Amino acid sequence: MPENIIAGIPVHFPFEPYDVQRAYMEKVIICLRDGTNGVLESPTGTGKTLSLLCSTLGWIRTRQSEVQLNMQKLQHDQQTQLTGAAGAGAAMGSEIAAVIGKSNNWGVPKVIYASRTHSQLTQAMRELKRTAYANMRAVVLGSRDQLCIHPDVMREQGNSNKVNMCKLKVHAKSCTFQLRVESKKDHPDFRGPSIMDIEDLVKVGQRLKMCPYFASKELVNSADITFMPYNYLLDPKARKANKIELSNAIVILDEGHNIEKICEESASVQIRSSDVAIAIEDVTHIMKIFTSSSDSQDTAGPDEPKDFTIDDLTLLKEMLLELEKAIDGVIVDNKADGATYPASYMYELLGKANFTHGNCATIVALLDKLVQYLMVASQHSMLRKGGSFMVLADLLNIVFANKGDIMSKVSCSFKVHAEIEESKQSQTNNKAQTGWLGKGNNNAASSASKTGRIINFWCFNPGFGMEQLLNTHVRSVILTSGTLAPLKPLIAELAIPVAQHLENPHIVNEAQVYVKIIGTGPDREQLISNYKNRDNPKYISSLGQTILNVSRIVPDGLLVFFPSYPMLNQCVDAWQASGLWADISSRKPIFLEPRGKDQFTSTMEEFYQAIRDSKGACFMAVCRGKVSEGLDFADRNGRAVIITGLPFPPLKDPKVILKRRYLETNRTRENQLLSGNEWYNLEATRAVNQAIGRVIRHRNDYGAILLCDARFQDASQVQQLSKWIRNHLGARPQSSPFGPIVRELRQFFKHAEQTIVQPVERAVEPVLHTICSKKEDQLTLAPITQIKREPGNTGTSKFQLASELAAKVEMANSIKTWTPADYANAAGRNAQSPKAPNPMDFMSRLNSNVTSIDFNADSGRDLVKIHKRERSSPTFHNESMGSKKRYRLINNIAQSELKEAPESRADFLREVRSVINSDQFRSFGKALLAYKTGGDDSFETLMLLLLDVMGAPKLRYLLHGMRRYLKNEHKSEFDVRLASLEAAQL
């Protein structure tokens, strides 16, 4: 790759950098060289991530070379000085060099690259793989939910349950994957030169039968660059657990427009009355174990840690009872709005139960011991896992992290907000039914019928989180994003010294972007999505007509962003009732942003595939949602974006009210903080800027930006838009009549298609990967958890297949990445003949050749159906079946029921979902997940479920179709079971 000298450092860049990229890299290198901090804004599509990685790692590589030369010189000098004792001198010189080599690369800083989501981190790692620095040591830290490969853990619902199950197995030394980490961590496949993202770690872990989650931690110490989400970086406990050392480190905070909120959240905490009540019950439970074991054999087991006494438990229980009494006594006069108290009130509340700065560390240590004790004790019962103790420990750690010498700062930066919690009696009953609570003592039981409280300790000063980071003695902090402006208030709120700052222009020219404010719809109804107008049916209809007209002009992908989910749902319902939904769908298939992670994955797959259709597709999403924050809609995936309104935070939300009040109270001319109103408006505009940034993704991209809200004409709103967007709107932006906009938009796309080089689609990669990696021809099972019918009046309903292991769909940057042909059919858009199956798609392995002969196609009388099934399993052998045709009489079955299992994966799943109930389908998905990584036991479980769910004659065709999903070693047994079932019913 070409080498460029930037700020005196050789930087390898994939091409000759543009001026904006060179300016950006120069600022980065100056920060690293001088050990200072920087706040750098560069619009989405200017190559920000690539510039950031190349400049940072270019400086690191130069520093490594300098250190290596210094080390060689030192070794040479020492050997020269010790020539009098040649043998000893050489040995000592080698020893010193070895020690130096282990000491954190002897002064070479490590790079910590943090972003908001794993989706963004994966995109960054993909950029790194394309650079000359792809051979540098890199690791990504992920959660158990993403990295764990233990089938028992992955069967658990919810991240907290997975964490607890993992901890139980690790503590009991029963996780074979974790036990292999020590012996496999130096394996060439794991320590190889290639950069491994989440997906790569999982694949290597499965191949080596080694835990990817714990193995990734082993790479941190030797990595040149470590990728992680914000919470891993800002949470001291997470840093310790993941062995993250920040001293002399370079910290990069990418997508930093969220950093203020994340810093505030990292210093905030919540406790409920029910949390304390459960903690009391848990302590009582442990005390009972202690009491019963004093007169008999230890009932809890000899391996449980007992480095605490019954006196410790008694004292803790007394404190918890007092804390429960104090929390329940908090006065909340207005149940709807709650009650707000100064920060000191939290310390008074805890002080009533004798929780103080002085004993905080001791109590937290005791709580950690109790959690470990309960985890071991609950291995068999799985009733108590110490979750309440963890909540209490978090509360104490966060509240008492603020030392007494900064209490004046705490008092103006924090507030206590109390709310009413639902009846503790109902919660207690629910918990008791699941075995979570014991009977407890009389005091706890007597308070169970009282109304509980939720106590929030909210931080409104993001400087607290940044101060913790700076106190670790990092070398440099680089905060960067496409939407940081205005920079001065941001820097003031974060309270960090900033030596370098930058606001870059965009690299695209005027002919590549069309930006317009649409103040009225085709019917001349004003488009304004304020609170008063959102229920106006004329406005909603006009907005739908606007989207319909735009969908007729925009080629390929159209993105439509709404201010909130309620507004999106309201519009969808109204358009379905009026027929507008069907009209838009006839132009472009519509995809809605789902709120669940699993559904989101499959929806994005379907959207990317639909883009290949000549009509393209329309994706309706929400500002601040996953689509607006983390996804890339380059080229055909997003040719236009419609912003339907300004996504202001809820005006009456207590946290919003208190944040505005905090800014007004603490704002001075010197600190340049925003006013409460300015912050409120900026929150909406930053979300808009993020949504707009999904479209223009690179130098040769083009697209239209349509702001469909009359309020965008206000000068205050325009000034908060990204600088490059303001340049396209002009000095005095005004909305234009709808007719001219339609003509201009049509002309814009016509000109762009003629003058701008269209992207060349690369060969696609298979979406789904195999489970059985030993043999290429072995069958694979992707997890199937839920299929959801999208709302709509058209006859082409869309189905969403959720896939927990297909998280890489969130990372799809373009249609170049995805080509599963069955998604088009799943959406009901193509009724064409099926194409040849993709051998890498597990559903395409439905390769048992089946022929059906209907001897009575023209009548409704008794039908005879002949099946000839050629077994695909090389291990299958049954002389009784051989090549002999099997005849089966099917009495009085309607013509519509004579059918085979659908060939395509999506159609098959749609068929299954349509004929069984939701509980059966949920069990079906779980059984497939278990079978995916399990052995004979999991096959037996799956087989029993299939016979139960699909054993009826009318569903037998689905049971036959399921054979195609099985691993080769289980097909023979499946055939025997199926033959027995059919013989019994003849």
UniProtKB/Swiss-Prot annotation:
Where does the protein principally reside?
Answer: nucleus
Instruction: Indicate which residues the UniProt annotation says bind ATP.
Output: 42-49
For this entry, list what GO says about its biological process: DNA recombination; DNA repair; DNA replication; male germ-line stem cell population maintenance; negative regulation of DNA recombination; negative regulation of t-circle formation; regulation of double-strand break repair via homologous recombination; telomeric loop disassembly
Taxonomy, superkingdom: Eukaryota
Q: List the catalysed reactions.
A: ATP + H2O = ADP + phosphate + H(+)
Question: Which EC class is this protein assigned?
Answer: isomerase
Please describe what this protein does.
A probable ATP-dependent DNA helicase implicated in DNA repair and the maintenance of genomic stability. Acts as an anti-recombinase to counteract toxic recombination and limit crossover during meiosis. Regulates meiotic recombination and crossover homeostasis by physically dissociating strand invasion events and thereby promotes noncrossover repair by meiotic synthesis dependent strand annealing (SDSA) as well as disassembly of D loop recombination intermediates.
E.C. numbers: 5.6.2.-
Q: Which family does it belong to?
A: Belongs to the helicase family. RAD3/XPD subfamily.
Write down the InterPro entries for this protein, in alphabetical order: ATP-dep_Helicase_C, DinG/Rad3-like, Helic_SF1/SF2_ATP-bd_DinG/Rad3, Helicase-like_DEXD_c2, HHD_RTEL1, P-loop_NTPase, RAD3-like_helicase_DEAD, Rad3/Chl1-like
Motif DEAH box extends across 254-257
Q: Where does [4Fe-4S] cluster bind?
A: 148, 166, 175, 211
Localization per Swiss-Prot or TrEMBL: Nucleus
UniProt keywords (A-Z) are:
4Fe-4S, ATP-binding, DNA damage, DNA repair, DNA-binding, Helicase, Hydrolase, Iron, Iron-sulfur, Isomerase, Metal-binding, Nucleotide-binding, Nucleus, Phosphoprotein
GO CC terms, sorted: nucleus
PANTHER family registered for this protein in UniProt: DNA REPAIR DEAD HELICASE RAD3/XP-D SUBFAMILY MEMBER, REGULATOR OF TELOMERE ELONGATION HELICASE 1
* The protein's name: Regulator of telomere elongation helicase 1 homolog
Please list the residue ranges annotated as the Helicase ATP-binding domain: 7-326
Q: Which residues carry this modification: Phosphothreonine?
A: 875
Instruction: Supply the Pfam families for this chain.
Output: ARCH_RTEL1, DEAD_2, Helicase_C_2
Lineage of origin: Eukaryota, Metazoa, Ecdysozoa, Arthropoda, Hexapoda
Respond yes or no to whether keyword DNA repair is given for this record.
yes
What species does this protein belong to? Answer: Drosophila grimshawi (Hawaiian fruit fly)
Q: What GO terms are given for molecular function?
A: 4 iron, 4 sulfur cluster binding; ATP binding; ATP hydrolysis activity; chromatin binding; DNA binding; DNA helicase activity; DNA polymerase binding; metal ion binding
* Entry-linked NCBIfam families: rad3
